[in-house]
UniProtKB/Swiss-Prot annotation:
Pfam families according to UniProt: AA_permease
UniProt record similarity statement: Belongs to the amino acid-polyamine-organocation (APC) superfamily.
Superkingdom classification of source: Eukaryota
Molecular-function GO terms, alphabetical: amino acid transmembrane transporter activity
Membrane topology classification: Multi-pass membrane protein
UniProt KW keywords: Amino-acid transport, Membrane, Transmembrane, Transmembrane helix, Transport
GO biological process: amino acid transmembrane transport
Residues annotated as transmembrane: 25-45, 50-70, 149-169, 175-195, 221-241, 266-286, 305-325, 357-377, 383-403, 425-445, 456-476
The keyword Membrane appears for this protein: yes
Keyword Metal-binding: no
Gene3D superfamilies: Amino acid/polyamine transporter I
Protein name (Swiss-Prot/TrEMBL): Probable amino-acid permease PB1C11.02
Naturally occurring in which organism (per UniProt): Schizosaccharomyces pombe (strain 972 / ATCC 24843) (Fission yeast)
A single GO cellular-component term on record: membrane
Length: 505
């Protein structure tokens, strides 16, 4: 069966109800989350502030190129399956099968990580010590233990309820949740700069003091390389803006605006944020270690700022950001499972939508996996494991977005249809090769620290995604006997016509 997902009449499929502003903030909601607020803390502890800045800057270039490459294809062909569909159209249906299932699994794990993060965040109020929250919890009173259990359950329940709303209402809620996050990051940057200049508890100028003592780098070149997996986790979700293409109003105009808006602002906010964190906190700050996440580095800086209640307000925003990011992961995973069902790669029942155009069975199935992670007794270690898996999964996806982009352009050229590009990727052809090179190198090198000494759990978290993707690919390749799609035969028509009809409607 064909790997594509055609746009069906509105009553039978997803509804086009998302405006440009909602898509922009939905993208922010998926990107700005626990990866930035919590993930950079463990990266700072393991690698140092300079390594953190290098990894976010270098990988930021790759992410920017990825968003433009994907945006070019999404505007041309706005479908719910996004790059997973494009891989099937322009490369190989077996690869589409493999990547879509893997990316769906990635979104279920991402949802679990955001849900689990809420438990880590509330530890700021529940655990007064600076030690490991897991150890400290042994002496916590029953009501505090109850809060630690109820919080992630409530977060997951809220994610499910919000994803059952009509997509227009869901987009509006995400718009405001994401607006809060963007405002908070901007406020953090301003307060962090003031804190560095001397507006802090010690009333002293900090500057780059911590880049000298304890230092700018930790663990040398290994620290630099390993920091890229944390950066990849923080940038996870940048590619999922294209998943809104199937529900965007007038995608030919709304998607380019949303992609430009998101790409530039995310990179700017991220790089400045990691710099501000790196100049205000030494890498040996207690509680930043990935195995015992004490609190967000953002909360540390606000606490250092000295304003009463500022740290608690920051922590509350981080809690809401985990809810927002969970919403986005569930939204993305739901649309992928819907896409799989439409293409015949999953049971057809998952393509069933209610009267509001919500694939409600896909919502329930995607959220089910997150429940397993709620039973973990060591939230910090489990969250760190999930972080690595999600990061690697996204790097694999970015590589094949680039491959699809190259094949897409070749198909347009061979068939004489390059004039149809509404949103040309100005980084082509250099951009896709940058994506493949950078992510390909770090995909294999960043897990080096798991080898010396060898740590099985850490090794699995870095490399389990590779055999999963390869195995799924070979299973479908052998079963369906698929072949590489010829550039002269690649389908450039089906959803391009739907795009014209949609925008003229």
């Amino acid at each position: 069966m064909d790997a594509s997902v055609s746009l069906l009449p509105e009553g039978e499929s997803l509804h086009r109800s998302l405006s440009a502003s909602q898509i922009q903030m939905l993208a922010f909601g998926g990107i700005i989350g626990t990866g930035l607020f919590l993930g950079i803390g463990s990266s700072l502890a393991e690698s140092g502030p300079a390594s953190l800045l290098i990894s976010f800057s270098v990988l930021g270039v790759s992410v920017y190129c990825t968003m433009l490459a994907l945006g070019e294809m999404s505007v041309y062909m706005p479908v719910a399956g996004s790059f997973c569909t494009y891989v099937g159209r322009y490369v190989d249906e077996a690869l589409s099968f493999s990547l879509t299932w893997n990316y769906w699994l990635n979104d279920t794990i991402a949802l679990a990580s955001h849900v689990l993060a809420t438990r880590l965040v509330v530890d700021f109020w529940l655990i007064p010590t600076e030690g490991d929250p897991v150890s400290a919890s042994l002496s916590l009173p029953p009501w505090k233990e109850a809060v630690r259990i109820i919080t992630p359950i409530t977060s997951l329940s809220a994610n499910i309820i919000l994803n059952m709303l009509p997509v227009g209402g869901f987009g509006e809620i995400e718009y405001w949740l994401s607006s809060i996050k963007v405002f908070t990051v901007a406020a953090f940057i301003v307060n962090g700069i003031l804190c560095n200049l001397g507006v802090n508890n010690e009333k002293k100028f900090i500057g780059f003091r911590y880049w000298k003592d304890p230092g700018a780098f930790n663990n040398g070149i290994i620290g630099v390389i390993s920091s890229f997996v944390n950066a990849a986790f923080a940038y996870a979700g940048t590619e999922s803006i294209a998943l809104t293409a199937g529900e965007a109003k007038s995608p030919i105009t709304t998607l380019p605006k949303a992609i430009r808006f998101t790409a530039h602002r995310v990179l700017l906010l991220y790089i400045i944020s990691v710099l501000v964190v790196g100049i205000n906190l030494p890498y040996n700050t207690p509680g930043l270690d990935g195995d015992s996440v004490r609190m967000s580095p953002f909360t540390f800086v606000f606490k250092k700022f000295g304003v009463p209640g500022a740290a608690s307000i920051m922590n509350l925003v981080i809690l809401s950001s985990a809810l927002s990011a969970g919403n986005h992961s569930l939204y993305a995973g739901t649309r992928l499972l819907y896409s799989l069902a439409k293409s015949g790669h999953a049971p057809k029942v998952f393509s069933k939508c209610n009267k509001h155009g919500i694939p409600w069975l896909s919502v329930l199935a995607t959220s089910a996996t997150a429940i397993l992670c709620l039973m973990s007794s060591q939230a910090g270690k489990t969250w760190g494991f999930l972080l690595n898996v999600i990061a690697v999964s996204n790097q694999i996806s970015w590589i094949f977005i680039a491959v699809s982009s190259l094949r897409f352009r070749k198909a347009l050229r061979v068939q004489g249809k390059t004039h149809r590009l509404y949103f040309p990727n100005w980084t082509y052809p250099v951009g896709p090769y940058i994506i493949i090179l950078l992510n390909g190198v770090f995909l294999f090198l960043q897990g080096y620290k798991s080898l010396y000494p060898f740590r099985l759990s850490l090794f699995v978290s870095y490399y389990m995604e590779i055999p999963i993707v390869l195995g799924l690919y070979l299973i479908w390749k052998i079963y369906k006997k698929t072949k590489l799609v010829s550039s002269s035969e690649a389908d450039l028509e089906t959803d391009w016509k739907s795009l014209e009809d949609t925008d003229s409607a």
